[in-house]
């Protein structure tokens, strides 16, 4: 009798776990629901945990405040989905008072409830690069599955993305460490292509060549986090705080970078970034 009861209990637990698991379609649905609810200025439409945490540009707020009060519909969505961790991230272009804003959201889902919502909002004039008009169609490469032979383990994908940030921070110094970039790799910052095109008075260079030359020398990167990792598609989201000293003026930038990795080489980087105050925080550990 005890054995039967134990079997029933185990089966019930398994069914409960299966019922609360959020697969790729489920996670994307949460992202879409978030963007749609935000466009309607009604956070009550979202299934959230009582202890849900929400930040906007590093500041903790009550869900429904900030951009929620002014955001309109989105015209572009690029997803990164991590069923293993229950995390999802997306980049979007969102209308605000008739003007486009570039938006990033990361959600953590547990037991079919949103427990964390981390967002970045970049408006015109709040970043060095701002080209939402170029963000019309999500790049197909991020939705392509990586062949089994070229897939990397979760830990390796994180190392590859972190190595990129190390290269950016050490470029132009004796401690420079190369990033695992594919020869054809491209980087886009707030919609603008910043590799293989003339930049900062320099001729067109590959992503690797820019770093080798130390084109962005003097950047400090901290608070690295990699909460979203999609092994099947080779996609990693890295979140960092970057400190720059350009022409004697200090600037702090919150950045979300979405990496596409194939065969242990980064093939594309899509970044959303926004300038914040010198005393800013990420809002997350």
Task: Identify the role of each PLM range.
Residues 1-8:
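Sec-dependent signal peptide recognition
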